[in-house]
Swiss-Prot record:
Domain of life: Bacteria
Family designation: Belongs to the ABC transporter superfamily. Sulfate/tungstate importer (TC 3.A.1.6) family.
Recorded catalytic activity of this chain's protein: sulfate(out) + ATP + H2O = sulfate(in) + ADP + phosphate + H(+); thiosulfate(out) + ATP + H2O = thiosulfate(in) + ADP + phosphate + H(+)
EC number of this enzyme: 7.3.2.3
PANTHER family: SPERMIDINE/PUTRESCINE IMPORT ATP-BINDING PROTEIN POTA, SPERMIDINE_PUTRESCINE IMPORT ATP-BINDING PROTEIN POTA
Main subcellular location of this protein, as a coarse class: membrane
Record localization: Cell inner membrane
Protein's membrane topology: Peripheral membrane protein
Name of encoding gene: cysA
Protein name: Sulfate/thiosulfate import ATP-binding protein CysA
Pfam families to which the protein is assigned, alphabetical: ABC_tran, TOBE
Length: 336
């Protein structure tokens, strides 16, 4: 099922949570709504679900106006951050709950539950209670329950936010595989850039109730549409108030954005390098973070592979020379 959002706005009192959002979500895609707290991503998800009604605009499902349809009429599955499982029911009973409400024949319920237990890799755990499961297993039960009624759209509101880092990473890979198997249109909310980049086909970056950019993970990272997107998607250095001479001879102030991995460090001057001094070296395991201070006092962060770091023999307080491998500039900057 494709989703079309046309000029949708939603306010709560004087606070405008969603501002004139236009968005197309292709049928069968896996889309991340990504942004900081207060960006409007969860409100937009609830508008798609029918849990909130927009003040203005329309929401279309497969081309049909569903703006004021109920959740039941939309046939949407919704999974919250905190599982919301029935504690007094077994895993099997939790998954079957929606099917029983719809009075599906018992034989079909049993077959569907068995199919879903296998799909979410919980075969053999159907008779356990939620308290006997790990956090990751509980979230998989919640996903199975949402999928049981064969929804046309699956909505996930920060589904892994309450889990520890290792489990989150495992479930991200699992969710991607699950989506490839079931092909249901899926929209999930996250503030975790890595999670969005790893899982989604398309990322919708939101800020202050508006959509900043829509694109594939590669497009969002390599071609950010605004300073906000550049700053929010991964670590970035900002060199402020650099002056560039324009063709007509006037000057313009630009901020230069540099990814830490795009800073080249040399131990000797080489071409258009700039002098800097190493302030601190942090070993991250898979790479080395080098904190630098320019002669004018501005601070930068560079990431080096372990191999390159070992080649350079860098130490704190050492003078080095840096240059960008790639940089982006924007005429105006606003913070996240």
């Amino acid at each position: 099922m494709g989703i079309t959002i046309e000029n949708v706005s939603k306010s709560f009192g004087s606070f405008q949570a969603v501002k004139q959002v236009d968005l197309d979500i292709a049928s069968g895609s896996l889309v991340a709504l990504l942004g900081p707290s207060g960006s409007g991503k969860s409100t937009l998800l609830r508008l798609i679900a029918g849990l909130e009604m927009p003040d203005t605009g329309r929401i279309l499902l497969t081309g049909k106006d569903a703006t004021y349809q109920s959740v039941q009429e939309r046939n949407i599955g919704f999974v919250f951050q905190h599982y919301a499982l029935f504690k007094h029911m077994t895993v099997r009973q939790n998954i079957a709950f929606g099917l029983e409400l719809r009075k599906v024949p018992r034989a079909k319920i049993n077959a569907r539950v068995a199919e879903l237990l296998e799909l979410v890799q919980l075969t053999g755990l159907g008779d356990r209670y939620p308290s006997q499961l790990s956090g990751g297993q509980r979230q998989r039960v919640a996903l199975a329950r949402a999928l049981a009624v064969e929804p046309k759209v699956l909505l996930l509101d920060e589904p892994f936010g309450a889990l520890d880092a290792k489990v989150r990473k495992e479930l991200r890979a699992w969710l991607r595989r699950l989506h490839d198997d079931v092909h249901v249109t899926t929209v999930f909310v996250t503030h975790d850039q890595e999670e969005a980049m790893e899982v989604a086909d398309q990322i919708v970056v939101m800020n202050k109730g508006q959509v900043e950019q829509v694109g594939t993970p590669a497009e969002i990272y390599d071609h950010p549409a605004s300073p906000f997107v550049m700053s929010f998607i991964g670590p970035v250095n900002v060199l402020r108030s650099r002056v560039f001479q324009q063709s007509e001879g006037t000057a313009a102030h630009c901020d230069i954005f540099l990814r830490p991995r795009d800073i080249i460090i040399e131990t000797r001057p080489n071409g258009n390098t700039v002098s800097a001094r190493i302030h601190r070296i942090i070993h991250l395991g898979w790479e080395i973070q080098v904190e630098l201070r320019l002669d004018d006092g501005q601070e930068l962060m560079a990431h080096l592979s372990r191999e390159r770091f070992d080649e350079l023999h860098l130490e704190p307080q050492q003078q080095v020379f840096i240059k960008p491998r790639e940089a982006k500039s924007f005429p105006l900057y606003y913070s996240i």
